[in-house]
Structure formats: C-alpha cells, structure tokens
Amino acid sequence: MINTIEGFFMNYQPAIEVVRGGTVESIHHAAIAVVDPEGKLVASWGLPETSTYMRSSAKPFQVLPLLEAGGASRFDFSLQEIALMCASHTGTDAHVRIALSIQEKVGVSEGDLLCGVHPPYDPETADRLKQEGIEPTANRHNCSGKHSGMLAFARLIGAPLEDYILPEHPIQKRILKVLGEMCDLGGEEIRIGVDGCSVPTFAVPLESAATAFARLADPGSLSQSRADACRAVWQAMTTYPEMVAGPGRFDTALMSAAKG
C-alpha cells in the first residue's frame, strides 16, 4: 500500500493533462493494468503491481459463492435481483422493490441488514423523501443488494445470519477464498480492511484485480460451476444496468450505451 507522497509518484504516472488556453491546468495520475484471462499482463501504465482496495468493484465477485452454490435456483432469483447484489445503487423506489423481493424470497427482512443507512444517492428520490418527511431506511443504502445477497448465502449454507459482516463468518471466509482464486492470490496475500458498509474489503495488486475481471468476462478456463456463476453475473449486470447504479450514473450510462 502507498503510505507516502513519494510512493504515490512511484506507482502512479501522469496519464491525462487538462489544458486551458495553452496552459496545463491539472494533471491526473493513474496506474493501469490490462490483463488477459490467463493472468498475462498485456499493457500497463504506472506500476501494475500497485496494491489498492477494490471497494465496491469487488461486488461481482462477492456474489459468486452464492451463485456457485446454487443460490439462484434455490431462491429463484431473477437477473434483476442478481444485478442488485452487484450494485452500488442510488436508492430509488425501483431498487428498494428489488431488495425487498430478494429478502422475501430468502426469508429475511430489511432489519437484518447491517449495512447502515444513508440518504438515497438519487437526488429526486432524496428530495421527495425529505419533502414527505420520510426517513431513509437500510434498503436505500447503496449496498443493500450486496448485503441481501450475503444473507441469502448465509441462509443457503445454514450459517448464522447474525454477524455476517465479520471476516471470520463462514460466508466471508468463502468470499475471500473465491476472490483469491479469481485473482490468482492466496488469502494471506490479500489485505483486509473494513468497507463503508461494514463488510470486509480487499486490497490486491491492480494486475490481480484485472485478472479477476478478465475471467469474469471470459470464464472459459474456470470450472463449470464458477464459469456459470460468472456468466450469470455478467448477464445480470449488462441486461439491467439501471440496477447496478441508477439514472444519471456513469456506469449505468456506459453499459446502456455500449450494450454491456
């Protein structure tokens, strides 16, 4: 991890210059890794081995154990519901409806979520709730889909619903193992922090994260069950990009414009 200014400039190199009137106004640094599904580095900028927290970009991998264990068929999850489990959503009424649907199928409630509460990211929804005097609840949290998926996995394997956010909980141990396999890393090579929604978050080398995403998009080299889970995630997110974020959000707009 980078702990000094000197370390930052070693790992990240100038990538974009913003020019105004012939004068460079700002410089944006980056570390970039382009990797194929076999883990081969194809292109890079800066240091591709730079370690960084995946944060919400890990969500598609955090749902893989649930799908690989047969959770989609056990609970009859729709693609919309799987997309929400991978989402940093904006808390619209549409997102809340899907979160409630997941919870009803699993047999849990909004009160079981340990993600906390914040106002919806969607400005129109936030303004409406404020005008109506309605306090936001946990399902408005951008990570409510992910947490609902984690509760589903706990229910599926017969693990306690309580404390599902702790690193030592069986579902979090399984998530760490699967992420390590997707990244070609051992669990001891992954640094664990606490994400903003209270679950573990993972610091990995940039090229390792890129390997995981390359395999998510092209899972042909993976086991059948893992490949099927990856394809389900890919199909869900690209079919329902509005579930992954929401109206006016960059990732939803990009997936919609690029058809995936």
Predicted features, each with a name:
Residues 2-49:
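Beta-lactamase-like hydrolase cores
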Residues 54-72:
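Active-site SXXK
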Residues 224-260:
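Conserved SxxK-family serine transpeptidase/carboxypeptidase catalytic domain
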Residues 200-219, 229-236:
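Active-site-proximal alpha-helical segments within enzyme catalytic domains
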Residues 76-86, 112-116, 191-196, 225-239:
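Beta-strand segments within the central parallel beta-sheet cores of soluble alpha/beta enzyme folds
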Residues 5-12, 78-189:
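Active-site-adjacent helix/loop patches that line small-molecule binding or acyl-intermediate pockets
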Residues 24, 54, 139-147, 166-171, ...:
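Short, contiguous, pocket-lining structural segments
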Residues 45-53, 85-89, 133-141, 193-200:
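A short glycine/serine-rich beta->alpha loop
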